[in-house]
Structures are given as C-alpha cells and as structure tokens.
C-alpha cells in the first residue's frame, strides 16, 4: 500500500439554533486533480463511519480536534466530509469559522492503481487512513506531486515517463528510415 494525501475545501453553515456545521468537499471523481491523481468512483474504502479529525496530521491525542464522517456522494460524484470541532480547541474552531483554516488533507493508502496515458495516477482502490485540518488553503495552481504521491510513486511515475519517451524516440528514428 502507498500513502496519498489530498486537499479539500471547508464550508461553514450556521444552523437555526446558532450552532455551526462544517463540511469539506473533496476532489471530483474522474477528473485529474492538481496533484496529478484521478479517483475512480467510490474507490476509497472506509473501515468505520467516523474518524478522528487531526490538526496538521498530528499523531498524538492532543492533535485530535474533532471527528469526521467521510463518504462518497454519488449525486455530486465527490467525497464529502461532515465534521465536528471539539471544545478543546476554541481558537481553531474560530479560525475555521472566520475562514483562516479552509482546507482539509485526506490521506489514504492506495491498494490498486495505474498510470494513465497522461501519467496521472488513477486510483482504483484505496483504504482511508485519516483526515486533518491544515493551514495551507486549497490552491488550484499548486502542485504537490512529491508530497501527494510520495517518493516511491513519484519514482514509479518517472520510470513510466522515461519508458514512454524512449519508445517515442525509437518510433521517431524508425519513421526516418521507412
């Protein structure tokens, strides 16, 4: 299995009773995201309904700032995240409400994948790992290939690109002599 992380944006809704509801919207399925990853429909498997919401991918219990339900929504063809922030982090709660924190990072282990003709990583199956509130907002122009794919997948992708380029060179040379 290989670890992947992706970003999602956060929406804050004020309920009639004055409480806040939070929802994160993940990458669309079937579209290459800014990390060069394509998720196939409903490819991420979940071992349980709710997961701890971490702060900046922290592993310690002090970094648990809430809990979240992540799920595939067929109607929108996206992974959605409904989450609650605990009272132990009032500054983080306020920062989310004010828009200072507007990104989630979703991590999962891919168990079945391939690279398509554009060298994008196509995820066919994955096991959900964790979700974190992160300080870096979603940026459509950002490329996080090294962090998103990890070293092992980046090397594999580079080898595929090199092989395709070498094959193209051979085909070009062959055409010259035909």
UniProtKB/Swiss-Prot annotation:
BP GO annotations: proteolysis; viral procapsid maturation
Keyword annotations: Coiled coil, Hydrolase, Protease, Viral capsid assembly, Viral capsid maturation, Viral release from host cell
Any GO MF annotation of the entry: peptidase activity
E.C. no: 3.4.-.-
Matches recorded under InterPro entries: Peptidase_S78_dom (IPR054613)
Coiled coil, from the record: 146-178
Enzyme class: hydrolase
General function of this protein: Probable capsid maturation protease.
UniProt record similarity statement: Belongs to the skunalikevirus capsid maturation protease family.
Protein name: Probable capsid maturation protease
Organism: Lactococcus phage SK1 (Lactococcus lactis bacteriophage SK1)
Highest classification ranks of the organism: Viruses, Duplodnaviria, Heunggongvirae, Uroviricota, Caudoviricetes
């Amino acid at each position: 299995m290989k670890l992947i992380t992706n970003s999602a944006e956060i929406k804050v809704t004020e309920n009639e009773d004055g409480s806040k509801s939070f929802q994160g919207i993940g990458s669309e399925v079937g579209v290459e995201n800014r990390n060069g990853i394509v998720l196939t429909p409903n490819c991420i498997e979940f071992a349980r309904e709710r997961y701890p919401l971490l702060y900046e991918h922290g592993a310690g219990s002090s970094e648990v700032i809430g809990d979240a339900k992540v799920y595939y929504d067929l109607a929108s063809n996206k992974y959605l995240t409904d989450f609650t922030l605990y009272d132990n982090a009032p500054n983080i709660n306020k920062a989310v409400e004010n828009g200072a924190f507007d990104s989630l990072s979703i991590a999962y282990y891919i168990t079945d994948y391939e690279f398509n003709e554009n060298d994008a990583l196509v995820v066919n199956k994955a096991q959900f790992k964790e979700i974190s509130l992160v300080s870096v907002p979603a940026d459509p122009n950002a490329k996080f290939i090294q962090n998103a794919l990890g070293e092992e997948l980046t090397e594999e992708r580079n080898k595929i690109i090199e092989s395709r380029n070498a094959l193209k060179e051979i085909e070009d040379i062959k055409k010259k002599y035909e």
